[in-house]
From Swiss-Prot:
PROSITE patterns: RIBOSOMAL_L11. The gene is rplK. This is Large ribosomal subunit protein uL11. Keywords: Methylation, Ribonucleoprotein, Ribosomal protein, RNA-binding, rRNA-binding. One or more lysine residues are methylated. The keyword RNA-binding applies. SMART domains: RL11. GO terms for biological process: translation. PANTHER family: 60S RIBOSOMAL PROTEIN L12 (PTHR11661), LARGE RIBOSOMAL SUBUNIT PROTEIN UL11M (PTHR11661:SF1). Belongs to the universal ribosomal protein uL11 family. GO terms for cellular component: cytosolic large ribosomal subunit.
């Protein structure tokens, strides 16, 4: 018989830096899950990623106090800010431009995010990420 799902917990945790402090501890603790077990498993799963990049994770909690988790790729906005070398996007993206990204940088971001994107082709995925860049106040070159 399949385990009964008690909760789906969505968090953003820095890659390789999960610890019992908020937001991980309280989110897992109130469901009765083993916090240290999650931290060790998450840090092992994200050891290949660049340390410190926010990584979305979806934790499925079961009635017998066990869990499984799925890590997603880093949000496009974080990757775009890193590529453009800016700390935050523009407050008025249509009038104030805060940085530039090239098509090559967009293609690299698409390669990182390809598992989470629904686009069928590389060109469509690049256009999706370019739209995100423009909505943050970044100029897309190329």
């Amino acid at each position: 018989m399949a385990k009964k799902v008690v909760a789906l917990i969505k968090l953003q945790v820095k890659a390789g830096q999960a610890n019992p402090a908020p937001p991980v501890g309280p989110a897992l603790g109130q469901r009765g899950l083993n916090i240290m077990e999650f931290c060790k498993a998450f840090n092992a799963a994200t050891s290949k990623l660049e340390p410190g990049l926010p990584t979305p994770v979806i934790i499925t909690a079961y009635s017998d106090r066990t869990f499984t988790f799925i890590t997603k790729s880093t949000p496009a906005s974080v990757l775009l800010k890193k590529a453009a070398g800016v700390s935050s996007g523009s407050k008025r993206p249509n009038t104030d431009k805060v940085g530039k990204v090239t098509r090559k940088q967009l293609e690299e971001i698409v390669k990182v995010k390809e598992a989470d994107l629904t686009a069928a082709e590389l060109e469509a995925a690049v256009r999706t990420i370019a739209g995100s860049a423009r909505s943050m106040g970044l100029t897309v070159e190329g």
